[in-house]
């Protein structure tokens, strides 16, 4: 079997970017949630 390193590189890059977006979305959601909690505590 001959491995196509270019294909593997693109595959890894896609997975990395997908995981990065997923983590970014989680951090963004947590940031909004914590922000709302602070606002509720202030009121």
Curated annotation (Swiss-Prot):
The N-terminus is blocked. Keywords: Chloroplast, Electron transport, Membrane, Photosynthesis, Plastid, Thylakoid, Transmembrane, Transmembrane helix, Transport. GO terms for cellular component: chloroplast thylakoid membrane; cytochrome b6f complex. GO terms for biological process: photosynthesis. A deletion of this gene can be substituted for by a subunit IV-petL fusion. The fusion protein does not permit state transitions, although all other functions are wild-type. Belongs to the PetL family. This is Cytochrome b6-f complex subunit 6. It comes from Chlamydomonas reinhardtii. The lineage of its organism: Eukaryota, Viridiplantae, Chlorophyta, core chlorophytes, Chlorophyceae. The gene is petL.
